[in-house]
Amino acid sequence: MQPYEPKTKKPVVHRAIFEAIKQRIKHWESDATIIAGRFGSGKSVAVREALRGVQGVFVHSIEDADWKDKLFKRLGLAGPDMLEDVLCRVQAQLEKLGGLSKVPIIVLDIPRTTMEGMDTVSSFAKYLCSDDTMKAAAHVIVCASSAAMAMAFDAGGEQRQKNYWVEDFTDDEAKEFLALRGHREDWEQFVQACGYRALDLDLTCGDYEGPATLAAKKEEMDKKARKEVLRFKDQCKIAGDTGKEILEELLANRQAGKGADELCTAASPKDVAMWIRERGYHSVIWHTVKQEYQFASELHANAATEILKSTPSRRHNWP
């Protein structure tokens, strides 16, 4: 049984989240694992690196409502009836090998473009991870492209899933990441221009032609953050001035280093997360582990400070 080896085109910075996921795999007993985080934070990389060298891993992308049929076809199965027997055989082999995981691992990767199929993902994961009637189990890891997709997952309540959140880079991670791309000395200029999101830093490294590239990138990022904050404030009106209420609460709590509780607005976090996903104005995120709203980045927090300081406040505490 071949160990899983992710295809990586560039050097990867080791991150604490890799080890956290590895420990989950090593000590797994039941229930699905959900990996979420801001778009471009490196969720897929985190999952794949945590699984590097692990045996019994299968990765499948959820692209439409027919994803299960495609999964069975890729596994060489005529249908779901054969799945349990295959899992039994794989589990028996894994127990003999004594590797990190004693059960098969199925990774379900959900791209941002996926619009359907989450209900069947939830039931599939519950069946494989938590169903006591199964002769064999499988550890299902769901890598969700957005908080909305992670929150749409429901395998029987929070007690039947374990959530992990992939943050943006820390200072040390960003420094190492940029050093690997030839920017050890000017790494601070990169994060000042781009922030700490892995995708932004990676793309800017690819485009870099000198200091002017960073100046142009900073201007572009500032404009984008301002636009996203304005759109969220003015257009997110799920239940009253939803967007504005969330932004005001975030600013009020910013100095204390806290996010905004879901009760700062009458709208549910799930509805807000879906609105953000559908509209594409990612100024705010719902953190699925800390269970709070947060600014997507310091750029968005700074833009919100400037925009709201001239706007009358109408904060509420909703029941």
Model regions and ranges:
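A short, basic N-terminal segment
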Residues: 1-33, 148, 280-283, 290, ...
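Walker A/P-loop nucleotide-binding motif
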Residues: 28-49
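Residue-level preference for the first positions of well-ordered beta-strands
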Residues: 30-34, 56-57, 103-107, 139
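Conserved NTP-binding/hydrolysis module of P-loop NTPases
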Residues: 52-56, 64-96
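Conserved Walker B catalytic segment
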Residues: 90-159, 170
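Conserved AAA+ ATPase "SRH/arginine-finger" region at the nucleotide-binding site
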Residues: 162-174, 181
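Amphipathic alpha-helical "lid/sensor" segments that cap RecA-like P-loop NTPase cores
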Residues: 171, 180-245, 269
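C-terminal leucine-rich, beta-strand-based interaction scaffolds used for sensing/assembly
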Residues: 222-319
